């Protein structure tokens, strides 16, 4: 995957086809903490009674992952990277209404194979 506006390649793989890693710059992390809020918790409780997807939480989770990913890419750019490999996501419940979402990977400089 590429983020043209960021000019950074990102992948969950260890390598990027067609590119060679020329320098490893280190681990980069992007974190966001989101609050579900009282309304969201109430809606989730009501939906859990009948079952099914809780769309408000899905949307919040997607936005949080994207924010964490963007922050991780920003850290990589600060190091001079043009790619991030081995990207992973993690999440933790900080308390009953707050979740921490983390994106992390290895910032690298890559060169296109000739």
From Swiss-Prot:
Gene3D superfamilies: Hypothetical protein apc22750. Chain B. Pfam families: YbjQ_1 (PF01906). Belongs to the UPF0145 family. PANTHER family: UPF0145 PROTEIN SCO3412 (PTHR34068:SF2), UPF0145 PROTEIN YBJQ (PTHR34068). This is UPF0145 protein YG5714_0873. It comes from Saccharolobus islandicus (strain Y.G.57.14 / Yellowstone #1) (Sulfolobus islandicus).
């Amino acid at each position: 995957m590429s983020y043209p506006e960021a000019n950074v390649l990102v992948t969950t793989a260890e390598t990027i086809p067609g590119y060679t890693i020329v320098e490893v710059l280190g681990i980069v992390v992007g974190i966001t903490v989101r609050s579900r809020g009282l309304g969201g918790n109430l809606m989730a409780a009501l939906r859990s009674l009948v079952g099914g997807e809780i769309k408000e939480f899905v949307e919040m989770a997607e936005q949080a992952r994207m924010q964490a990913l963007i922050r991780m890419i920003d850290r990589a750019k600060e190091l001079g990277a043009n790619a991030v490999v081995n990207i992973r996501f993690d999440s933790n419940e900080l308390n009953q209404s707050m979740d921490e979402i983390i994106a992390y990977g290895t910032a690298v400089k890559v060169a296109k194979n000739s």
